[in-house]
């Protein structure tokens, strides 16, 4: 399938590109060992995505994590998180473990964390929400500057973990998905507002290969 990403730009061991031809171009700035991402884009959802992606290729089983230090949204549904993606096409199968900018209720989600996935190219996205519903306190609240995200791959099983400095890694969800053994991984950001950019500060990115 032909990719509709703009030509990738090399950056500190990663490449970065706009996926899905968003109206506003995205950018990346290195700050120490972290990255500030700016992105436009309509959304990462339904059958096709628009976002900015800071990525590298990983093969086999792995464990990746990142801290979202701050998040300036352009919409209630602006999304920042870790992406695992089969291709750079806008309709690619993928998984994303993400945070929203605050703990406001959003449809089925009470809290700020969410896991979503697309099983086939051009298919609809699905989401895994926290089980807690209003008026209870959020089950997975954001806690900036310490909103941590972690993704682990073991074969076709993908596990998402959330953490703050208040508590250790907690399993958010597990999902089976048949993806290629070599995938694109890294921080991703979408504005959910085609005419206004969002900004997120990603820090403390780590990765390890599993044998």
PLM-predicted stretches and their roles:
Residues 1-211:
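Extracellular glycan-recognition regions
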């Amino acid at each position: 399938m032909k990719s509709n990403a703009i030509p990738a730009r090399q950056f500190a061991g990663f490449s970065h590109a706009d996926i899905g031809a968003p109206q506003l171009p995205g950018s990346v700035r290195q700050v120490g060992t972290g990255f500030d991402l700016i992105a436009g884009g309509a959304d990462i959802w339904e059958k096709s995505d628009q976002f900015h992606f800071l990525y590298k290729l990983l093969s086999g089983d792995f464990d990746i994590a990142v801290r979202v230090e701050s998040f300036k949204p352009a919409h209630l549904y602006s999304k920042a998180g870790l992406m695992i993606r089969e291709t750079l096409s806008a309709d690619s199968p993928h998984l994303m473990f993400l945070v929203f900018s605050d703990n406001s209720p959003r449809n089925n989600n009470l809290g700020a964390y969410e896991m979503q996935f697309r099983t086939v190219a051009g298919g609809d996205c699905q989401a895994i929400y926290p089980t807690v519903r209003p008026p209870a306190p959020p089950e997975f609240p954001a806690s900036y500057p310490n909103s941590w995200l972690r993704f682990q791959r073991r074969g076709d099983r993908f596990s998402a973990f959330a953490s703050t400095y208040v508590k250790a890694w907690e399993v958010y969800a597990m999902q089976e998905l048949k993806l290629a053994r070599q995938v694109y991984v890294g921080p991703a950001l979408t504005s959910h507002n085609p005419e206004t950019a969002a900004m997120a500060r990603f820090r403390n990115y780590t990765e390890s290969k599993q044998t």
